[in-house]
């Protein structure tokens, strides 16, 4: 399995598949926000940023999957998935165990050199409450679904990182 994951990490297909899944999730988030009129909270926006990190890592990996640039993509992927797990876990706990003392910020805080909420307010401005339950599917709230998705991204990222020393076997069908 590790040899297979190493082989996949050196091809564009797996990286593009990951980019497609992250882009589909981002578009779904925008659908919820602009069509279903659900208000994203601060943690939702940070979770979006983590998902954009996974998307960016996938695009970097797809550019040059056989070069050391793929290792940069894997580190970004691992970090983004880990931060996504942290954020969605915190968000899930805020929704499952609401407390007047445990709240999220009122505004998204981006660095001054990267004010995404000013540049693209349709995507990065938060207007909802983190503890408010707005949507569920099969009994799970949106942060719980995202927690599962980020855990899956993280597990696969760890396995792909572990697989890097395992070189793919050369298949010689007609040799002895």
UniProtKB/Swiss-Prot annotation:
Membrane-spanning intervals of the chain: 15-31, 50-65, 72-89, 145-163
Write down the superkingdom of origin. Answer: Bacteria
UniProt subcellular location: Cell inner membrane
Q: Can you quote a single GO CC term?
A: plasma membrane
Q: What is its main location?
A: membrane
Keywords for the protein's UniProt record, in alphabetical order: Cell inner membrane, Cell membrane, Chaperone, Disulfide bond, Electron transport, Membrane, Oxidoreductase, Redox-active center, Transmembrane, Transmembrane helix, Transport
Q: How does it sit in the membrane?
A: Multi-pass membrane protein
Q: Which cysteines are joined by disulfide bonds?
A: 41-44, 104-130
GO biological process terms, alphabetically, are: protein folding
Q: Which residue stretches are annotated as topological domain Cytoplasmic?
A: 1-14, 66-71, 164-176
Query: Which GO MF terms are attached to this record?
Result: electron transfer activity; protein-disulfide reductase activity
* Pfam families noted in UniProt: DsbB
Periplasmic side of membrane: 32-49, 90-144
Q: Could you tell me what this protein does?
A: Required for disulfide bond formation in some periplasmic proteins. Acts by oxidizing the DsbA protein.
Q: Which NCBIfam families match?
A: PRK01749.1
Report the family membership: Belongs to the DsbB family.
Q: What is this protein called?
A: Disulfide bond formation protein B
Organism of origin is: Shigella sonnei (strain Ss046)
